[in-house]
Regions:
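Bacterial Sec-dependent N-terminal signal peptides
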Residues: 1-13
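Metal-centered catalytic cores of metalloenzymes
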Residues: 2, 22-84, 88-174
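Bacterial N-terminal signal peptides
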Residues: 11-23
């Protein structure tokens, strides 16, 4: 009888240890998924919904550091930039604004285009993301659920757009 009790305790201890090990491993996996800090979007008029006729194109990059997102957007073929936002939405879907990328920026005209550099924090969020932590945006950016939309006077709903993905990801950018 004593031998059976000891065997049961050993089995119970082994099961608890296994659960703790799986839990710790899973937590590490979740952290690794959300630890991506660099993101990129390739901007193009064919990605607009519906697509527009424009030769403009660009690249937007985002780097998360110390609860701040630093942004860089380089665009060619546009000189009259009137808006730049991150919005929620998958490829082919229009979504709701998350953050205005022109709120805190330094905008310079380049030969044949525009370069924008700036930053934002979670306090700049609007819409459904308002009041949420930066990690919520980080998670959405890592799963292709956000996009950048660039607006102009000729195309007030958007001239070029691109899905945000982790930098270096091999998944499609559009």
């Amino acid at each position: 009888m004593q031998h059976t009790k000891i065997l049961h305790l050993v089995i119970l201890a082994t099961a608890l240890f296994s659960l703790l090990l799986v839990s710790a491993t899973y937590s590490g996996y979740i952290y690794a998924q959300n630890s991506q800090t660099k993101f990129r979007a390739k901007l193009d008029s064919n990605n607009e919904v519906p697509p527009v006729n424009s030769t403009a194109e660009g690249v937007a990059t985002f780097k998360l550091k110390n609860n701040t997102v630093n942004t860089k957007i380089n665009i060619t073929g546009i000189t009259d930039l009137s808006g730049a936002q991150i919005l929620s939405g998958k490829k082919g879907e229009n979504g709701q604004p998350i953050v205005d990328l022109l709120k805190k920026v330094q905008k310079t005209k380049t030969s044949g285009g525009v370069a924008v550099e700036g930053s934002f924090t979670a306090s700049d969020f609007e819409g459904a993301m308002k009041g949420k932590a930066l990690s919520a945006l980080q998670s959405a950016m890592g799963t292709n659920e956000t996009y950048v939309n660039i607006k102009t006077k000729d195309h007030p709903d958007g001239e070029i757009r691109g899905q945000i993905k982790p930098k270096g990801s091999s998944s499609p950018t559009q």
